[in-house]
């Protein structure tokens, strides 16, 4: 049997994983029975906060990464290099926990690290990895400082909150204009770490220019166990729109508390809402989730490949959250770079990532193009919870529903 038939190559992998049309048709992911690729294997650091306040998101991120690793290995691994050997790390929901894992992964000889999830973790872990010229692919972390420090080892697959906030506000203005401008006042509720505080600063700078008056900006720590006082403030000020920016647990609690206290603004419009674009939230608390809009990471709903993976994830009894398909796509990106580099050498892999044009992901991005570590094609979409489902409402090219605004009474 020839080497070509024995091992993973780029085209074959994309044709035989969840990225295959046949998988989309059946809802399963078919992997051919082929021999292991030649080589001793490639170690990949898979780093997420799987315990602590961010554990749900971290576990979802690990799930997505490992599904991609398992599929690549079932297809034979990386041609000429062997199978991917995942080195799992738990950031424990803290930057310090993350950097400790980077040290362990470097000692273990990983070729690359994927993950991090939270902005403050990613800032610390990418810096730690840079000391060893260890390539690092950020899955989600949105703080733009992650990619503005000149770190040659750092690559962010998704958009940062500069792009996200600009898109979110342009879309909010468009939705409001289309409805006859019923909304004029806003309150912002955000978590107080790097992610939420940075986003709140951008919103405060940009919302007034779009004709919105900001009544109040309310920070809160992560974790927060009680939002009664926050919701009482919202109820007293009665804003037209509430903009939450927080992680999953706090988002759910805020939305449920608003529902319980019968606070009904014209719209709940999230920017990177931790639960707003989550099937878990919609299933477990459908009444609290109704009509919530979000600007966030999301898969391309027209992409049959993405729908195939969704079926497989749900078949495992899990929810298809953005952490899953972002990490899945990131591992495919790394596999493609390893294939092109034909080496697990860190410098060669860094160069291969920097020159990537990978398009076999699940996102509405187009081909990957890194400029100073940022994927220039990455962009968020707007979603809304409609009929106990999550629909894309903007941009029109990816939409499968139209926005409902103001929220029905």
Regions found by a protein language model. Give the residues of each.
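N-terminal secretory signal peptides
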Residues: 1-12, 21-27
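C-terminal segment of N-terminal export signals and the immediately downstream linker at the start
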Residues: 6, 29-53, 57
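Extracytoplasmic "Venus flytrap"
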Residues: 45-66, 89-96, 117-120, 189-198, ...
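Beta-alpha junction/loop-to-helix N-cap segments that form part of ligand/metal-binding clefts
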Residues: 56-61, 78-148, 157, 220-227, ...
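Signal peptide-proximal N-terminal region
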Residues: 63-86, 177-181
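Extracytoplasmic ligand/sensor domains, especially the bilobed periplasmic-binding protein
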Residues: 110-217, 266-290
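Extracellular/periplasmic periplasmic-binding protein-like sensory domains
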Residues: 258-329, 396-408
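Segments of small-molecule ligand-sensing domains
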Residues: 315-324, 333-392
